[in-house]
Amino acid sequence: MEIEIQTKPFGKMQISEKQILSFPEGLLGFEDYKKFALIEEEEESVFKWLQSVEEVDLAFVVIPPSLFKKEYKPLISEQELQGIGITDLEDGLMLVIVTVPGEDPALMTANMQGPILINKKTLLGKQFISRNESHSVREKILASAAVEMD
């Protein structure tokens, strides 16, 4: 069944109810918002939008971290993973929130310390805190991608 949602980047749009992700604990700093939709801007784009279904002004640019940091593996316990019904990181869709500074998009950063993991079967999601202290909340995406390409 299709429902209409209001989005920050695209205005009104129709999405399938099956596109709605449930975050029982919300996202860090936004614990009151539990329902989100993952929206693709364009099919070719690596960036997606994680849009709150409950609050139009709450939307995050997200990207799979493997696109610019191939060896990224956050430290998350099996017990934490079981909270969304998965047993291994590979069983979920992993995303990180991207911050794009208006003055210079080339300086965009990703929150590698707080990855989002989504159970692809149940659409349950959670934002975790990686216990790997080498992960930054402001990892420069283009700098990391350039190093990965060397």
Swiss-Prot record:
The organism's superkingdom is given as Bacteria
Organism expressing this protein natively: Leptospira borgpetersenii serovar Hardjo-bovis (strain JB197)
Q: Where in the cell is it found?
A: Cytoplasm
* Protein family membership: Belongs to the FliW family.
A GO CC annotation given for this chain: cytoplasm
Coiled coil residues, start to end = none
Its biological purpose: Acts as an anti-CsrA protein, binds CsrA and prevents it from repressing translation of its target genes, one of which is flagellin. Binds to flagellin and participates in the assembly of the flagellum.
Protein name per the record: Flagellar assembly factor FliW
Q: Supply the alphabetized keyword list.
A: Bacterial flagellum biogenesis, Chaperone, Cytoplasm, Translation regulation
Q: List the NCBIfam families.
A: PRK13285.1-1 (NF009793)
Family matches, as Pfam families: FliW (PF02623)
Its assembly, as annotated, is: Interacts with translational regulator CsrA and flagellin(s).
- Output one GO BP term: regulation of translation
